[in-house]
Amino acid sequence: MALRIEVGNEDLTMSRFALSPLWELTHALRLLAHPPDEPVLRPWLLRARDRYQALTREADIAVILALNPPGWGADFLAPVPAGVSTTIGNLLDEVRSTPAEQAHHEVAVALRRQPHMDARIRRILTGDGVAGYVATCWRPPGGRCSSLNGARCGPSSNATWCTGPGS
């Protein structure tokens, strides 16, 4: 049995060989908020648990998680990096400059998938400037870079939770 995959120009244009640090962070947060019963992840989840708890006190992690219901995630939350040298700062600039129409469309999808969302989070997500607010959530006060897990953020990445200017 042969498998044939056809790839067009648009597919190739959207292909990247660079990992998105914000995508890695989004999924690390999702794992920490709703830990799966996966033995292979248990050591990382235990190591990252305290840092995650601290982050929930420093930043509005609930807003980021609300944009990532099971089986779906808002695209503007973790833009595709232009290349391997793209910084978290570059990506946060992209998040901030998300067109309002795109952000509101993606928020609407997230809201439909979570009809019982907390009223405070719903107000934030449906308000003006949601993309800028999300960029602020990625960079809580503190002026430092720290990871959820020492040298690694996700269970298999080297992405860092950046909290300082120019990170």
Predicted region positions:
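N-terminal, charged low-complexity regulatory/assembly segments
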Residues: 1-167
